[in-house]
């Protein structure tokens, strides 16, 4: 079983912001595989089903980004998830160029407050993650304003392809494992 968590902030105000690329990623996976998000459990919207023979739970924490760890820990406990082998977190990354994907088996939280919350609540950095590049803020723009801002029109036009590649990468993880997915998507 896999718990696949897309990070974001709840509410229409944040729906199309850079910080919500994780939510949009799990929405794309759900749509592709005919899964429907249902009312909350453990402060999350959930969609459950099978993807390529793997039981999956897609989750969108509704705790706001900075408290994502509360929802992730509650879900890991509820579903008896081993984070090192059965958790995948998808989130935005300022340190990667727009549309660059980076899959890792483990690693630090970096500057991402949602990941900091998850690491603090789980007490470990030993869990897989898929980082999605959103690029750096232009000029002297504040990072918080940037991540809570909307994509440019050119970026928004590129999102369907990007979200498709993210879904493809997750499917490779489920079918062939993390190493194969890292080898296939990290160099691009």
From Swiss-Prot:
Top-level lineage group: Bacteria
- Tell me the CDD domains matching this sequence: PTH
The positions annotated as site (Stabilizes the basic form of H active site to accept a proton) read 92
Major localization listed first in the record, in broad terms: cytoplasm
Sorted keywords for this record are:
Cytoplasm, Hydrolase, RNA-binding, tRNA-binding
Q: Which residues form the active site?
A: 19 (proton acceptor)
The UniProt annotation places tRNA binding at: 14, 64, 66, 113
Which InterPro entries does the annotation name? Answer: Pept_tRNA_hydro, Pept_tRNA_hydro_CS, Pept_tRNA_hydro_sf
Biological process per Gene Ontology, one example term: rescue of stalled ribosome
Subcellular location per the Swiss-Prot or TrEMBL entry: Cytoplasm
**One Pfam family linked to the record:** Pept_tRNA_hydro
Sorted alphabetically, the Gene Ontology cellular component annotations on this record are: cytoplasm
Per the UniProt entry, the Enzyme Commission number(s) are: 3.1.1.29
Q: Which reaction does it catalyse?
A: an N-acyl-L-alpha-aminoacyl-tRNA + H2O = an N-acyl-L-amino acid + a tRNA + H(+)
GO MF terms held by the record? peptidyl-tRNA hydrolase activity; tRNA binding
For the site labelled Discriminates between blocked and unblocked aminoacyl-tRNA, the residues are: 9
Cystine links in this protein are none
Q: What does this protein do?
A: Hydrolyzes ribosome-free peptidyl-tRNAs (with 1 or more amino acids incorporated), which drop off the ribosome during protein synthesis, or as a result of ribosome stalling.
Cite the record's note on assembly: Monomer.
Family from the record: Belongs to the PTH family.
What name has this protein been given in UniProt?
A: Peptidyl-tRNA hydrolase
Provenance organism: Chloroflexus aurantiacus (strain ATCC 29366 / DSM 635 / J-10-fl)
